[in-house]
């Protein structure tokens, strides 16, 4: 039986989502739910990050980026940050 990954949001990611325009946050939430929640390979939709974000993955949704950590042992995708592409990597 193949494992399907569950999507979880950190407190910071939920704060980021609430700061965004309502229409943008709905698009991001819907995309994550459709493509990542319950999928068998969350790495297929994203790109691995390097340097100080090594071990993290990013998903491109329009001009916004979702930074995640994929935890294979717990079979979850933990959303860490959500933001505009011009500011998401400044943190």
Question: Can you annotate each of these PLM segments?
Answer:
Residues 1-11, 15-19, 23-26, 30, ...:
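Enriched for short, Lys/Arg-rich terminal
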Residues 34-58:
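A short, surface-exposed loop/turn module that caps and links secondary-structure elements
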């Amino acid at each position: 039986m193949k494992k399907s990954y569950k999507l979880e949001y950190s407190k910071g990611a939920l704060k980021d989502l609430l700061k965004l325009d309502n229409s943008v946050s709905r698009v991001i939430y819907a995309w994550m739910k459709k493509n990542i929640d319950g999928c068998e390979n969350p790495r297929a939709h994203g790109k691995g990050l390097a340097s100080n974000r090594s071990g993290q993955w990013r998903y491109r949704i329009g001009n916004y980026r979702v930074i995640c950590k994929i935890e294979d042992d717990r079979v979850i995708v933990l959303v860490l940050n959500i933001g505009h592409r011009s500011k998401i990597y400044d943190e």
